[in-house]
Amino acid sequence: MNSASSASASERLGRAARRCRAALSVFALAIAAAASLYPGGSWTEPGAAGFSPLRNFWCDLVRTQAINGADNSASRRLSCVAFAALACALWWFWPIAGALLPPGRGALLQVLGRISTLALFAMALLPSDAHPVWHGVVALAGGGLGMTCAALCCIRCPAEPRYSLRRASAYAALLLAALNAALYIYVAYVHGPETPLQPGVQKLATLALVLWMAVTVRRALAERDLSGAAAR
């Protein structure tokens, strides 16, 4: 790669990193605001007030009507902003994560990752109360692709320590997402009982995802700076 193309790639990486971080910040603020405005009700406590991280799913926030029967318009609007921001963050994240991998694997990651991101957009447009079947299908398809991407990212970078926060958070995101998907299938399709376990696992999977994204962006920028210093 010549110096001009290398500089261009470095600029693209930096631009994607800034956008990814900004979108993650919007997601965190918007999802917190949406949760604070949720009227109440969960599948295990239909008459409860407010949003419970251990009893409510994120998709409860995008319902037109809360589970307790109250209007959920305000929370729905903010949660749609939150999930759109997360989807944008992921859209810019996949090329960043791919930059740490061998070229062929990185290109595959970018394609699969961006397809899974489109599924996240679709989930916001297909709330579970209005489209229960399609919401589940899109969630499982997008989640499966996302888990494949996380597995691709578990590979160790050349200069990376054997045990790193980037790889540990990727493994955590992968395992928690797999457990969340298994619990979803058990409840939705095998008709298992509703418990606080799945909503709790979902929140842990989200935290692991955000941590993995943040650490990966930092790692990619550090690798870029090292490469730039070596080239000078």
Which residues does each PLM region occupy?
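N-terminal signal-anchor transmembrane alpha helix
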Residues: 14-44
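Short, Lys/Arg-rich, polar N-terminal cytosolic tail immediately upstream
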Residues: 1-13
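Terminal transmembrane helical module of multi-pass membrane proteins
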Residues: 152-232
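Cytoplasmic juxtamembrane regions at transmembrane-helix boundaries
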Residues: 89-117
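Membrane-proximal helix-loop-helix units in multi-pass membrane proteins
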Residues: 109-157
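Individual transmembrane alpha-helix segments
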Residues: 65-100
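Hydrophobic cores of alpha-helical transmembrane segments in multi-pass inner/ER membrane proteins
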Residues: 24-28, 83-91, 144-153, 205-219
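Extracytosolic (periplasmic/ER-lumenal) interhelical loops and adjacent juxtamembrane/interface segments
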Residues: 44-71
